[in-house]
A protein has these predicted regions:
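Aromatic- and acidic-residue-enriched segments that line the glycan-binding/catalytic groove
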Residues: 63-70, 105-119
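Distinct, well-ordered alpha-helical segments
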Residues: 71-84, 105-109, 141, 149, ...
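Short, small-residue-enriched loops and turns at beta-alpha junctions
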Residues: 58, 101-102, 160-162
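N-terminal binding-site loop/beta-alpha segment at the start of enzyme catalytic domains
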Residues: 1-93, 97
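Glycine-rich, aromatic-flanked loop segments that form ligand/cofactor-binding clefts
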Residues: 89-112
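Glycine/proline-rich, positively charged
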Residues: 109-162
C-alpha cells in the first residue's frame, strides 16, 4: 500500500493529490461490479485518496424521467468498495455531483430546443438532461448520502459539461 500525500488544505480539510473518477465504472460500457470494485481497490492501494462519483452514474431505463432500475449504482459501488477495502477509510475524500439526469436518448439540440439542456456522450445512445433546480439538488444530495452510506457528504458539487 502506498502512503497518500496531500496538496494542501481547504477549509480545514486535506486535499488529496491523487484522485480517481468512477463514471466509466458505472455507466454504459461499464465492467462487471466485481471488476469495478477491484479497480477502485487497486487505485486506493496505489495511493488514491479522492474518489469522484455522481448521483447520475447509472443506466437509464425510462426516457427523460431519471428513474432507473440501478439508480444510485455508481455511488453504491463506491460505498461497497470502501466497505470491503482494508485501508484507512477516514483518509478517503468522496466527492459526488448532482445536476443531471440520464435519458434514453439525447435529442439533437440544434433541431429542437428542449426545455432543459440535453447532452450525449460520444458513441452512446444515452444522454444527459440538465436539472439543477434547487429542490432537485437538495433531494439528490439526500439520496447521495443514503447511496454512499454516510450521514454527511464529504463534498458535493453541480455537474457541468461546459
Amino acid at each position: 500500500m502506498t502512503t497518500a500525500r496531500n496538496m494542501g488544505e481547504l477549509a480545514g480539510f486535506a486535499i488529496p493529490r491523487l484522485g480517481m473518477g468512477t463514471m466509466a465504472l458505472a455507466i454504459e460500457g461499464r465492467p462487471d461490479r466485481d471488476t469495478a470494485i477491484r479497480t477502485i481497490h487497486a487505485g486506493l492501494d496505489a495511493g488514491v485518496r479522492y474518489l469522484d462519483t455522481a448521483w447520475s452514474y447509472y443506466l437509464p431505463s425510462q426516457p427523460g424521467t431519471g428513474t432507473a432500475e440501478d439508480l444510485g449504482y455508481g455511488e453504491k459501488m463506491v460505498r461497497d468498495a470502501l466497505a470491503s477495502w482494508d485501508g484507512p477509510r477516514d483518509e478517503v475524500l468522496i466527492a459526488t455531483k448532482t445536476g443531471y439526469r440520464r435519458t434514453m436518448e439525447a435529442p439533437n439540440v440544434a433541431e429542437n430546443k428542449p426545455e432543459r439542456q440535453h447532452l450525449q456522450a460520444v458513441g452512446s445512445q444515452y444522454g444527459w438532461m440538465a436539472d439543477s433546480r434547487p429542490e432537485t439538488m437538495i433531494c439528490d444530495a439526500k439520496e447521495s448520502a443514503a447511496h454512499l452510506g454516510v450521514e454527511a457528504l464529504d463534498q458535493i458539487g453541480r455537474a457541468s459539461c461546459r
